[in-house]
Structure formats: C-alpha cells, structure tokens
C-alpha cells in the first residue's frame, strides 16, 4: 500500500499528499490507527492494484482511494467501493465525505460515477508548496 501511495505522490496531480509516507504512517493513517474505520485492498499478480480507506477527519467519515495509475478505469475503484460500502454500513456510517483536488479530473469523475454529490467548493485550497488547486467536497449518503 505504501509503495502504491508513494508512486502516486511522486507522479503528482491526483492527491493532495506531496511528501512520501512511511509504512508506519500508512498503517496508522489508513489501516489500524485510532481514526481508521475501514480499509479494503485490491490485489492482482502479486501486487497491490488499489486500496480505499475511510477514517475520521474533522468529525466526519472521509474516504481516500488510491489506484495504480496503470490500472485506472478498469473497474478496480468500483470494486473497492462496493466492498467499502459493506464495511461502512456495518460500521454505522451515515455519510461518507470525499475531498478532491479540483484539478484531479480522474478523481472527480470517479467519485461522480459512484454516486458522490458536491456540497462545497474551496477555490483557495493550496498544496504545501503554495500552488492553489482548489478542492471539491462531495458526499455519499448511505441512508
């Protein structure tokens, strides 16, 4: 999971993360830390093809999705979300939030395709390096 996330960070453009993560940080932030709710992984050919996690952030359940750039638009994200929905419902989550860079065209398309709807927009959201990319906030209601 760490290797995939760090490849996505290195490529840039589809995540607000700009600094590579350690395996310990990925584990704490996405798998079994105190703020983690769910985590699902898609594997194939002996490697991680994608993963999705929900965790508490600012009082809301937020989702993060990371799919190998060479495997996007092949149903991996939809498969992850189907499994995530089962776990989210079992955890009693009413609403899943997604915060997406406004310049992340594939991410915006993915979350729209699986049923997330816009509820806020921050045109001034900036990355750590100062670039303003904007941020779209979307949600998926489970009830």
How should these model regions be labeled?
Residues 1-17, 137:
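Short amphipathic alpha-helix that is part of the acyltransferase structural core
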Residues 11-70, 81-83, 87, 124, ...:
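Acetyl-CoA-dependent GNAT
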Residues 56, 97-101, 112, 117-134:
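Conserved catalytic-core motifs of GNAT/GCN5-like acyltransferases
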Residues 71, 75:
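Glycine-rich phosphate-binding loop
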Residues 76-77, 81, 99:
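A beta-strand edge to alpha-helix "cap/lid" segment located at domain peripheries
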Residues 80, 104-107:
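Conserved short alpha-helix immediately C-terminal to the canonical SAM/SAH-binding motif I
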Residues 88-100, 108-110:
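Conserved GNAT acetyl-CoA-binding A-motif
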């Amino acid at each position: 999971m760490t290797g995939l996330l760090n490849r996505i960070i290195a490529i840039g453009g589809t995540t607000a993360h700009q600094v590579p993560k350690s395996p310990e940080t990925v584990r704490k932030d996405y798998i079994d830390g105190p703020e983690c709710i769910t985590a699902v992984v898609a594997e194939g050919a002996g490697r991680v093809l994608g993963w999705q996690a929900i965790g508490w952030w600012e009082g809301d359940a937020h989702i993060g999705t990371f799919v190998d750039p060479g495997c996007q638009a092949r149903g991996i994200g939809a498969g992850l979300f189907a499994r995530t929905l089962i776990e989210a419902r079992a955890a009693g989550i009413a609403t899943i939030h997604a915060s997406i860079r406004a310049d992340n065209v594939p991410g915006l398309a993915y979350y729209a395709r699986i049923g997330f709807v816009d509820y806020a927009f921050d045109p001034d959201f900036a990355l750590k390096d100062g670039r303003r990319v904007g941020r779209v906030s979307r949600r998926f209601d489970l009830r």
